[in-house]
Regions:
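Non-catalytic C-terminal accessory region of glycerolipid acyltransferases
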Residues: 43-153
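Catalytic core of membrane glycerolipid acyltransferases/transacylases, capturing the structured
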Residues: 1-39, 46-47
Length: 153
C-alpha cells in the first residue's frame, strides 16, 4: 500500500519465508527483497545500504512487524541503522486502515501520509544517542501523522 502512494519507486525488506514460488515473484515485482529475520542477514543489510547510497527509496517498518490493532508500537533498536550508514534522510510515513482487511470489509478505507524528512546531523558523529533521538523523533512524527488521519486530516 505504501509503495503505491509514494511518488518514487519504493523497495522493501520482507521476511524470507514469504519468498516461496509464485508469491516470491510477486513480492519481487512489488519491490521487495528477502531478509532472514532473527539473525544478521549481511547480504540484505548491504543491499539496503547500497540502495540508499544510490538515492533509492527503502521503506522499513520501524516496529519490525505489522500492527494487528492499528496502534503504533515501539521502534526496533536498529530501525535507522541502514539509513545512518548511508546518511539517507528519513521520511516518516503512516498507513492507516490495513488492520481492518481481516475483518471482512470488501473495500476498507486505507490512508497513507508522508511527513517531512528528518536528516542526520552533518557535523557530528552518529552516536547511539543521536540514533535514539532520531528514532524518537521519527516515531513522534509517525504518531502525529497517524493521529491526523484518524482525526480526518
Amino acid at each position: 500500500v505504501l509503495g503505491t502512494a509514494a511518488p518514487r519507486k519504493v523497495q522493501f525488506m520482507a521476511k524470507a519465508e514469504l519468498f516461496v514460488p509464485v508469491l516470491g515473484t510477486i513480492y519481487r515485482l512489488l519491490g521487495a527483497f528477502p531478509v532472514r529475520r532473527g539473525g544478521n542477514d549481511k547480504a540484505a543489510i548491504k543491499h539496503g545500504i547500497d540502495l540508499l547510497k544510490s538515492e533509492g527509496v527503502l521503506a522499513i517498518f520501524p516496529e519490525g512487524t505489522r500492527s494487528r490493532t492499528g496502534e503504533l508500537g515501539k521502534a526496533a533498536p536498529g530501525a535507522l541503522m541502514m539509513a545512518s550508514k548511508a546518511l539517507a534522510p528519513i521520511v516518516p510515513a503512516c498507513v492507516v486502515g490495513t488492520d481492518v482487511f481481516r475483518v471482512g470489509k470488501i473495500w476498507p478505507k486505507v490512508s497513507v501520509r508522508f511527513g517531512k524528512p528528518i536528516y542526520f546531523p552533518k557535523d557530528e558523529p552518529i552516536t547511539k544517542e543521536v540514533l535514539k533521538n532520531m528514532t524518537d523523533e521519527m516515531m513522534a512524527r509517525i504518531a502525529e501523522l497517524q493521529a491526523g488521519v484518524k482525526n480526518g486530516n
